[in-house]
Amino acid sequence: MSFELPVAVYHRFEAYQGNKQSALLQEVRENLSNTYPQTTMRGDGQVVIVGFNTITVEVVPAFRYDNSGRFYMPDTNDGGRWKMVDPLAEIAYIDAADLNAFGNVRPMAQMLKTWKRHCNVPLKSYQIELLVAEFMPSYVYRHQDYFYYDWFIRDFLIWLCNKAWTNQTIPGTLELVNLGDTWLSRAQTARDRAIRACEHEHEDYTILAGEEWQKIFGDRIPIHVL
């Protein structure tokens, strides 16, 4: 979730010494903590992660750069910088991919964000969205519905395991972001579990399949579906 801050706040933090972006996220976290004192929060590079009971929200403070929809957001990595983003271009890219994949991009992205949270996968939410938007429009089963989501997840994870150290092009700004490989071992583990789950389903071992899916997504996934 992004929210726009007044430009005066930007100038105030520009006068800081040291990591201005880290100071901004710290102030955002403190203000949110005053409103939600019982909620766990932490800064994570470019966002403040707010862990409510039923949902985790990534809060992104931003400053308007121009009237075409581009913004500056904080990036605390490597000493800190202001990173330009174009949310409208990113939304348009996801919309087009979702249309080409028969409405399956957004549900898939939500499922994979659940995996990210449950297994502490070090991929950003926007990276997951862009990866799903890259994968789904050319996926052979993209026209199928949720009855095929087990195959969707399995095949996406197989594909994802070949994406280490590749670059993502961010829509709008055309920035290249390298994916690295810190997430790879968790993706490989999830891939292997998804493969086993699909094999168990094929053999009608639905509870064994459910156990594997719960290892990926947590116990909000039912262990057995009639």
Residue positions per predicted region:
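Acidic, low-complexity intrinsically disordered regions
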Residues: 3-5, 56, 139
